[in-house]
């Protein structure tokens, strides 16, 4: 067996074509760790019905951002940069929860290379059973069926890692540089929403998000800021306020310059490229907000890659 260590980057994934939108949505809505729709035996059938109805609308969103999600290419670029940062002795792989390359694909590639030591690194900074939890459980399921023995370690959160906070603050500063007077700017941290029931059941996601915001603001200093939640889906109670509600409230208060800071996303995909850049930008204009911008995503930011490398080395005992 190879003495190298495999680092598996766990990410949500996204459709790589318009034709892939409906099957991607089916994979998402079939996952009972993220959403429970009826009895377990019926969920695939209900998910199929929901996806057929939702797909045309979602396909139109993807048409506006180039006909696919860029998340695979961006995550593979992160993997390549991480491999370079870590140096000899490491190989980085990508495992997408709801599309390709799948967890099975990643483990098959690791097996072909004869690697037995695996570090699974969730690219969700803030732990939730619906995101990092689901990806790790999928990895464990596949490992149980792999027919080969891997020595596996897991990294399931890094919401307060100093280099993550520094990288995020750096991107906010980049966004602020587009405004002539930062004292006039309102920051809106926009995190992916989650059903309130998850938090009520003890999921730490909200507390992790709040900690990240607090730590970033400690670096940025005295700037007006707010936290809101985007990407709701379905009739259940979600975390509040929604990003749209927050924008309306701030516009009513006379705020004219706004910088949106995506949280819980470490690379660009539909939540940043469509929801923020197109949908929220249009709403901002309708609300009378004169200047609306988004801070750049982390993607392969050198500081962020350094953060991931430190996380890996801390597990390996090299930190």
Curated annotation (Swiss-Prot):
Fe cation binds at residues 192, 271. It catalyses: heme b + 2 H(+) = protoporphyrin IX + Fe(2+). Transmembrane segments: none annotated. CDD domains: Ferrochelatase_C, Ferrochelatase_N. One of its GO terms (biological process) is heme biosynthetic process. It is found in: Cytoplasm. It comes from the Bacteria. Keywords: Cytoplasm, Heme biosynthesis, Iron, Lyase, Metal-binding, Porphyrin biosynthesis. Pfam families: Ferrochelatase. Coiled coil: none annotated. Its EC number is 4.98.1.1. Pathway: Porphyrin-containing compound metabolism; protoheme biosynthesis; protoheme from protoporphyrin-IX: step 1/1. InterPro entries: Ferrochelatase, Ferrochelatase_AS, Ferrochelatase_C, Ferrochelatase_N. The keyword Transport does not apply. GO terms for molecular function: ferrochelatase activity; metal ion binding. One of its GO terms (cellular component) is cytoplasm. Its main location: cytoplasm. Belongs to the ferrochelatase family. Catalyzes the ferrous insertion into protoporphyrin IX. This is Ferrochelatase. The gene is hemH.
């Amino acid at each position: 067996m190879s003495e190298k260590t495999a680092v598996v980057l766990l990410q949500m994934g996204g459709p790589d074509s318009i034709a892939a939108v409906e099957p991607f949505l089916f994979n998402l809505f079939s996952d009972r760790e993220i959403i429970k729709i009826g009895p377990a035996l019926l969920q695939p059938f209900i998910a199929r019905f929901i996806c057929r109805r939702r797909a045309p609308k979602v396909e139109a969103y993807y048409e506006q951002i180039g006909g696919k999600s860029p998340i695979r290419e961006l995550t593979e670029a992160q993997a390549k940069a991480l491999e370079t940062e870590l140096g000899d002795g490491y190989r980085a792989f990508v495992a997408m929860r709801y599309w390709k390359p799948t967890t099975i694909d990643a483990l098959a590639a690791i097996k072909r290379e004869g690697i037995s030591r695996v570090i699974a690194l969730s690219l969700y900074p803030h732990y939730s059973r619906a995101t990092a939890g689901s990806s790790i459980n999928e990895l464990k399921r596949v490992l149980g069926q792999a027919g080969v023995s891997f020595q596996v370690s897991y990294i399931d959160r890094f919401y307060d890692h100093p280099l993550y906070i520094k990288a995020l603050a750096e991107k906010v500063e980049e966004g602020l540089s587009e405004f002539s007077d930062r004292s006039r700017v309102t920051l809106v941290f926009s995190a992916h929403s989650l059903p309130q029931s998850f938090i009520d059941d003890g999921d730490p996601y909200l507390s992790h998000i709040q900690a990240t915001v607090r730590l970033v603001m400690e670096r940025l200093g005295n700037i007006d800021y707010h936290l809101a939640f985007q990407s709701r889906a379905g009739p259940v109670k979600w975390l509040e306020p929604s990003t749209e509600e927050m924008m309306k409230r701030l516009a009513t208060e006379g705020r004219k310059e706004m910088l949106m800071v995506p949280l819980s996303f470490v690379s660009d995909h539909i939540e940043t490229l469509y929801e923020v850049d197109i949908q929220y930008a249009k709403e901002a204009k309708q609300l009378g907000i004169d200047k609306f911008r988004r801070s750049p995503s982390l993607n392969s930011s050198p500081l962020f890659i350094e953060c991931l490398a430190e996380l890996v080395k801390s597990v390996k005992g090299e930190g």
